Amino acid sequence: MANTTGEPEEVSGALSPPSAVAYVKLVLLGLIMCVSLAGNAILSLLVLKDRALHKAPYYFLLDLCLADGIRSAVCFPFVLASVRHGSSWTFSALSCKIVAFMAVLFCFHAAFMLFCISVTRYMAIAHHRFYAKRMTLWTCAAVICMAWTLSVAMAFPPVFDVGTYKFIREEDQCIFEHRYFKANDTLGFMLMLAVLMAATHAVYGKLLLFEYRHRKMKPVQMVPAISQNWTFHGPGATGQAAANWIAGFGRGPMPPTLLGIRQNGHAASRRLLGMDEVKGEKQLGRMFYAITLLFLLLWSPYIVACYWRVFVKACAVPHRYLATAVWMSFAQAAVNPIVCFLLNKDLKKCLRTHAPCWGTGGAPAPREPYCVM
């Protein structure tokens, strides 16, 4: 057996039955794996299958779902095996580095991706015309590739022992070995993760401030129409005089309201943001912020434990706190589908369409034509 903690241990051929704590860990992690794999698979299939979801926000959501699903399928089985073998690593040192690399890769990928999503949410509300014109499929692909490239750049150096990947017995996983900061190589990685999370929430704070400033509407000021020959033109005109003139009831010259009836081609081509689109963008913003907030809440205890190891040398992290923090970070891989189906009406509608038996009363029956008498 290869144990990368530096303390070789031997595992007997017959496995001892797991303790109550290990049994709880196995059950919880197994449940997290099932929910993550099923939820992310369903959400990914919906985004791929339904044309109504072929939009930039859902492409980013698809990338997050695929990353969480791969993390659950690749990394979590090794954690289950280590718990089953009494918090021991029974595989090679190379496999430990590979699993640790993938775990850190998916963590940083989620952080980078959530930051990019927060920027696109701000652009969708504050600069919608630019967003609608520039946020194409290829732009989304470029953003996703950039997030993966930055994640690889953050997770790859420890493979060459720049910040060491080792099996941490207290965490039952292969991950960064966080030591005291005077002999530590991982402080920079933790600072980068903290800066990313802070920057993401700063962008959402700016978006909230923008919406608050633009939610106040000016009161309607009634401007009287101007008329010298009963044509009634000007800012307060309703166009009724022009309609009367067209119908043959007008007298005198053509009303000024008809002189500018031909619109400017550039102004006509400018796309305005309707109320339905505003509500849709705000709904997507709330959903992605809920995902970001849960990412922060579920990873914060583990990040606090990492900083504790780096800056506090005299006192070790309590074992129960560390175990809870690690399993909370595992649970983050399963929460995204739940949040999306709870907060997104479009995803609920698509789910009912493709799985009518899950909806209330099945698929809606086609309406018969009728006439109002």
Swiss-Prot record:
<dbReference type="GO" id="GO:0005886">
    <property type="term" value="C:plasma membrane"/>
</dbReference>
<dbReference type="InterPro" id="IPR000276">
    <property type="entry name" value="GPCR_Rhodpsn"/>
</dbReference>
<keyword id="KW-0812">Transmembrane</keyword>
<feature type="transmembrane region" description="Helical; Name=2">
    <location>
        <begin position="60"/>
        <end position="80"/>
    </location>
</feature>
<keyword id="KW-0807">Transducer</keyword>
<feature type="transmembrane region" description="Helical; Name=4">
    <location>
        <begin position="140"/>
        <end position="160"/>
    </location>
</feature>
<feature type="topological domain" description="Extracellular">
    <location>
        <begin position="161"/>
        <end position="188"/>
    </location>
</feature>
<dbReference type="GO" id="GO:2001223">
    <property type="term" value="P:negative regulation of neuron migration"/>
</dbReference>
<feature type="disulfide bond">
    <location>
        <begin position="96"/>
        <end position="174"/>
    </location>
</feature>
<feature type="transmembrane region" description="Helical; Name=3">
    <location>
        <begin position="98"/>
        <end position="118"/>
    </location>
</feature>
<protein>
    <recommendedName>
        <fullName>Probable G-protein coupled receptor 173</fullName>
    </recommendedName>
</protein>
<feature type="topological domain" description="Cytoplasmic">
    <location>
        <begin position="210"/>
        <end position="287"/>
    </location>
</feature>
<keyword id="KW-0675">Receptor</keyword>
<keyword id="KW-0472">Membrane</keyword>
<feature type="transmembrane region" description="Helical; Name=7">
    <location>
        <begin position="323"/>
        <end position="343"/>
    </location>
</feature>
<keyword id="KW-1003">Cell membrane</keyword>
<feature type="transmembrane region" description="Helical; Name=6">
    <location>
        <begin position="288"/>
        <end position="308"/>
    </location>
</feature>
<feature type="topological domain" description="Extracellular">
    <location>
        <begin position="1"/>
        <end position="26"/>
    </location>
</feature>
<feature type="glycosylation site" description="N-linked (GlcNAc...) asparagine">
    <location>
        <position position="3"/>
    </location>
</feature>
<feature type="transmembrane region" description="Helical; Name=1">
    <location>
        <begin position="27"/>
        <end position="47"/>
    </location>
</feature>
<dbReference type="GO" id="GO:0004968">
    <property type="term" value="F:gonadotropin-releasing hormone receptor activity"/>
</dbReference>
<comment type="similarity">
    <text>Belongs to the G-protein coupled receptor 1 family.</text>
</comment>
<feature type="glycosylation site" description="N-linked (GlcNAc...) asparagine">
    <location>
        <position position="184"/>
    </location>
</feature>
<comment type="function">
    <text>Is a receptor for the SMIM20 derived peptides Phoenixin-14 and Phoenixin-20. It mediates the Phoenixin-14 and Phoenixin-20 augmentation of gonadotropin-releasing hormone (GNRH) signaling in the hypothalamus and pituitary gland. In the ovary, it mediates the effects of Phoenixin-14 and Phoenixin-20 induced granulosa cell proliferation during follicular growth.</text>
</comment>
<keyword id="KW-0297">G-protein coupled receptor</keyword>
<keyword id="KW-1133">Transmembrane helix</keyword>
<dbReference type="Pfam" id="PF00001">
    <property type="entry name" value="7tm_1"/>
</dbReference>
<feature type="topological domain" description="Cytoplasmic">
    <location>
        <begin position="344"/>
        <end position="373"/>
    </location>
</feature>
<keyword id="KW-1015">Disulfide bond</keyword>
<dbReference type="InterPro" id="IPR017452">
    <property type="entry name" value="GPCR_Rhodpsn_7TM"/>
</dbReference>
<feature type="topological domain" description="Extracellular">
    <location>
        <begin position="309"/>
        <end position="322"/>
    </location>
</feature>
<keyword id="KW-0325">Glycoprotein</keyword>
<feature type="topological domain" description="Extracellular">
    <location>
        <begin position="81"/>
        <end position="97"/>
    </location>
</feature>
<feature type="topological domain" description="Cytoplasmic">
    <location>
        <begin position="48"/>
        <end position="59"/>
    </location>
</feature>
<dbReference type="InterPro" id="IPR051509">
    <property type="entry name" value="GPCR_Orphan/Phoenixin"/>
</dbReference>
<feature type="topological domain" description="Cytoplasmic">
    <location>
        <begin position="119"/>
        <end position="139"/>
    </location>
</feature>
<feature type="transmembrane region" description="Helical; Name=5">
    <location>
        <begin position="189"/>
        <end position="209"/>
    </location>
</feature>
